[in-house]
Structure formats: structure tokens, C-alpha cells
């Protein structure tokens, strides 16, 4: 078990009733953002993981997909627009001091103002979708986050 898994309670997480019944990723509190930022800092001390990421526009929607291998910890940017989040796999979502295990195929309403961490227990695909008027995928990144310069699609 990794250090971050022990420290942040990833193992043994359960999909809480709130996430399961409401199907929402709520806005993250300041304390929750600080926790995910700490996970980001920890992640930066580790060898970089390969997280294939693709994005495109279709039918007025921006679609962004990350493929996370089992064992990989991925932290999200602070998302400033409401989105749909589609998860397929087995992953623990860490937000606001709570861990939620999501297995199989799940569609969630992602609220604006959220920043979460994902720890893949099995290979997992996460897709984010939101409506936009932009015509180029790269123009959507600053629209959905102020942290766009740190996104996987911006890394060289």
C-alpha cells in the first residue's frame, strides 16, 4: 500500500450514500482543495505516470477523457464549470476528506468549484463533458480551469 493511500484513506473506501444516491461531485471546500494540493505535491515527488488524455469538441460539447492505469493517483485541476463526469472502472475518488469507491460504469453531475483525486484500483477511464461555444479544444481548457497550464494535454 502506498504512502498516500495510507495517509488519505484510499483503501477500503466505500461509495457513500450521498455520492451514490445523488450522483454528484459537489464543490470542494478550502480544506478539501488543500488536501488535493498536498496529494499533487506528493505525486510530483514520484516518477510521472503515463495517463493518456484526449479531448475533442462535438455537438457543442467539450469532451475530455483520461485513462488511468491501476495503481495510479491522478489529481484534477480545480474545475470552474459544471460538467458531466463518466467513470468506467474501479477507482477511489477523494474529496473533502472522504473517499468514495466507484466501480463499474457511473455517470455523475460534477459541480463547478470541485477539485478531487482519483486512485485507480483497476484500469479506469474518466470522461468529463460540458457545453461550450469554443471551436478549438485548447480554448476550452482555460474556460474550465484556471490551472490549464498544468493539464496533461499541455505537458511537453
Question: Which residues make up each language-model segment?
Answer:
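Conserved short histidine dyad/triad with adjacent acidic residue
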Residues: 59-79
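Double-stranded beta-helix
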Residues: 121-156
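Tight coil/turn sites that cap or link beta-strands
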Residues: 69-71, 105, 111-113, 121-123
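Short, surface-exposed charged micro-motifs
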Residues: 54, 65, 75, 83, ...
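Conserved hydrophobic/aromatic beta-strand scaffold that supports enzyme active sites
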Residues: 63-67, 84, 99, 107-109
